């Protein structure tokens, strides 16, 4: 959500920022609605003052005038509410303003590689895809999932199910014991107000799994990411500055329709309607966002370092960032079967964008009430990490070596073989 006062005070800066996002917004309409809204408020305040003055008078002849003023106040209030609603609807559909140091570009082709780490495996055989490996092991069953549930689902079985669970536990243990995050086991259902707070609504309504519940008039959704529920923990709060930074982590199933992904990654586990993800969320003082983003990204890459998986870090350009982000680092892991890097984590600073929607604040050194900064990042996507292990640790006979870091979570087995 955007600060209308800031827009009003520097219209050209706002327009330039939107241009960097490559979106078209009628800023003049926003300013016109804002002016009308303020005019109605001023008219109402003048009428309320006049009514108050009349109430102090003992002149009974003014009684009828007071009644007319009450009607006028009601009419103006309705007009003002309509204008305010239209203004907020437009503002809530506009993405966050990019941080000045984010590279300008229209799409992923303008993203900038920051670094690479790890050694890309040099196989003496043609590497198989994760879904070929999993099906040959009899541990990934996409056909059965299609039969029971539909496309973009999978049954993960036996040792691969164990590996998936091991990954989640390993990631949580690392983030809690080494990186200083507090583990949370949150609800998996969010209200529309909660989804609005982090920016999923109203913009991405069509990509959410909505629940139809007879016992409530509120709309409710399966969470697309734990970011939604964790970030909203501070909704409508004034937080004690001493509690900042707040760092939280959760491992949850996530649910997405993938509405804009028709025809993409139709095979395998890369893009599914249901998947597990370990999510990190930080709530910080507003001027600490970018240092916290660097820290969070390092926490995510540490997992890949421990698993000895090759990856690269990129900074997203203005046109490729998510709706709520002011700056984003993506971490991409190497997939041998595709001969390229694929996203496994996205870490974003949202500045005060989500906080303004949630009314999440704290008292600064001057005792002023100001908006917090919010950040979120995958640490990591569990299914995609499973994919990366299958492909990078595969052997010529189709077996999969277990990474050293995961052996304590896997009863110290060395290798996953066909059942």
From Swiss-Prot:
GO cellular component, one term: cytoplasm
Record EC number: 6.1.1.11
Coiled coil: none
Entry keyword set: Aminoacyl-tRNA synthetase, ATP-binding, Cytoplasm, Ligase, Nucleotide-binding, Protein biosynthesis
Biological-process GO terms, alphabetical: selenocysteine biosynthetic process; seryl-tRNA aminoacylation
Subcellular location: Cytoplasm
Pathway where this protein functions: Aminoacyl-tRNA biosynthesis; selenocysteinyl-tRNA(Sec) biosynthesis; L-seryl-tRNA(Sec) from L-serine and tRNA(Sec): step 1/1
CDD domains on file: SerRS_core (cd00770)
Signal sequence extent: none
Homology family: Belongs to the class-II aminoacyl-tRNA synthetase family. Type-1 seryl-tRNA synthetase subfamily.
Task of the protein: Catalyzes the attachment of serine to tRNA(Ser). Is also able to aminoacylate tRNA(Sec) with serine, to form the misacylated tRNA L-seryl-tRNA(Sec), which will be further converted into selenocysteinyl-tRNA(Sec).
Subunit structure: Homodimer. The tRNA molecule binds across the dimer.
Family annotation (NCBIfam families): serS
Name of the featured protein: Serine--tRNA ligase
Natural source organism: Pelagibacter ubique (strain HTCC1062)
Gene name for this UniProt entry: serS
